[in-house]
UniProtKB/Swiss-Prot annotation:
Organism placement in taxonomy: Bacteria, Pseudomonadati, Pseudomonadota, Betaproteobacteria, Burkholderiales
Stated role: Catalyzes the decarboxylative condensation of pimeloyl-[acyl-carrier protein] and L-alanine to produce 8-amino-7-oxononanoate (AON), [acyl-carrier protein], and carbon dioxide.
Pathway(s) it belongs to: Cofactor biosynthesis; biotin biosynthesis
Oligomer and partners: Homodimer.
EC number(s) given by UniProt: 2.3.1.47
Protein name per UniProt: Putative 8-amino-7-oxononanoate synthase
InterPro entries listed in its UniProt record: Aminotrans_II_pyridoxalP_BS, Aminotransferase_I/II_large, AON_synthase_class-II, AONS_Archaea/Proteobacteria, PyrdxlP-dep_Trfase, PyrdxlP-dep_Trfase_major, PyrdxlP-dep_Trfase_small
Native species: Bordetella parapertussis (strain 12822 / ATCC BAA-587 / NCTC 13253)
């Protein structure tokens, strides 16, 4: 027993009273687009496996093959003796697909944002305190990276480029390198940044653009390689993950050769972490072969999003500015979100309730994540269940 167990218990009780306590639930494998949870198989509308690749046979086969040939682990960090030829092979393939000089693999999206940003700001400190402009709805890992670096964030209104440009113009004469840190697709709202306009704005103001492509990679942009590909000349740094649209694990940054070489020398999350293992690299490599050829699956996925948003609007449920495979059903009250999620689960569908502090108070929601593994039948089930479930929640309120 810990000496602080009474404090931990009190904190959990307070979270339960606010209807924001979390609990782990045991899941087991099921066919793509589904999940076996607590002994029941549910249609899964909470997974980030947007293209249904997590159970694709090519990923599993190559993961197994590379593990058999090269071992279960990389044995060390890459700067010690864990830099396998496989890492460089995957990075070269990724850089070609992203249209950048280089790419660098990291262990997770959180690790990338939390470690890469401080490394960038450290280099920039030679010119004085950096100016860091961040979207108000950025992911927690981006905020964490800024906080870890000790920089002050200058926050602009969500996806409001006019406000961002105003803030940049206000500080035009101030010393220090300038950074814009934002996402191309926002994970809780499913809306997109105007990446070409962002890149043009960054160029006008001589500002480094850091773009988190976690939820765009695999789904959006040329060949599914993210929205940075829509900007002439690209962006300064694109971060993305392999754990969502690519059905595997890990993360990357893509940019100039000088940038990636610098991160090898300055990014703590790269330097002090054991390298990704061969099985993971094999799955990533296979996904990179598949994704550019999946335009039809991407079109169907985004079409399902359009149909779902139209249905939610007809029911009077707010889905914000979503324009992607992520569609929030924003119901406001945390209790209502939990009740609606429970009603859907009773009907055989998993759509997890998202509550504060993940989203602002008063904006609790179901975060509905669509997948190419879902067909019209599953979408029909979801639309019908949402309509009936929302009626039941309102009647009980």
């Amino acid at each position: 027993m810990s000496k602080l167990d009474s404090l931990f218990t009190a904190a959990l009780e307070q979270a339960a009273q606010r209807q924001v306590r979390r609990r782990l639930r045991r899941a087991t494998a099921a066919p793509p687009g589904r999940l076996a949870l607590d002994g029941r198989t549910l249609v899964n509308f909470s997974s980030n496996d947007y293209l249904g690749l997590a159970r694709h046979p090519l990923l599993a086969e190559r993961a197994s093959l590379w593990a058999t040939r090269h071992g279960a682990g990389a044995q060390a960090s890459r700067l010690v003796c864990g830099n396998l030829d496989l890492h460089e092979q995957v990075e070269a393939k990724l850089a070609r697909l992203k249209g950048t000089e280089a790419a660098l693999l990291l262990a997770s999206g959180w690790q990338a944002n939390a470690a890469v940003l401080p490394a960038l700001f450290k280099a920039a400190a030679a010119q004085g305190e950096p100016q860091v402009y961040t979207d108000r709805l950025n992911h927690a890992s981006l905020h964490h990276g800024c906080q870890a670096a000790g920089v002050r964030q200058i926050r602009f209104r969500h996806n409001d480029l006019a406000h961002l440009e105003h803030l940049l113009a206000e500080r035009a004469g101030a010393p220090g390198a300038r950074f814009i840190v934002t996402e191309s697709v926002f994970s809780m709202d499913g809306d997109r940044a105007d990446v070409p306009a962002l890149a043009a704005l960054a160029a006008r103001h001589h500002t480094f653009l850091y773009l988190d492509e976690a939820h765009a990679t695999g789904v959006l942009g040329p060949r599914g390689m993210g929205l940075a590909g829509l900007a002439p000349g690209g962006v300064d740094l694109a971060m993305g993950t392999f754990s969502k649209g690519l059905g595997s694990f890990g993360a990357y940054v893509a940019g100039s050769r000088a940038l990636c070489d610098y991160l090898v020398n300055a990014c703590s999350g790269f330097i002090y972490t054991t390298a990704l293992p061969p099985a993971v690299l094999g799955a990533i490599d296979a996904a990179l072969d598949l994704v550019p050829r999946l335009d039809q699956a991407r079109a169907a996925l985004l079409g399902h999003g359009e149909r779902l948003r139209a249905s939610l609007a007809a029911q009077g449920i707010d889905c914000g500015a979503s324009s992607t495979q992520i569609v929030p059903a924003i119901v406001g009250d945390a209790g209502h979100a939990l009740a609606l999620a429970a009603e859907l689960e009773r009907r055989g569908l998993l759509a997890v309730a998202i509550r504060p502090p993940t989203v602002p108070a008063g904006t609790s929601r179901l975060r509905i994540a669509l997948s190419a593994a879902h067909g019209e039948t599953e979408l029909d089930q979801l639309i019908e269940a949402l309509a009936a479930g929302w009626r039941a929640v309102r009647q009980a309120a």
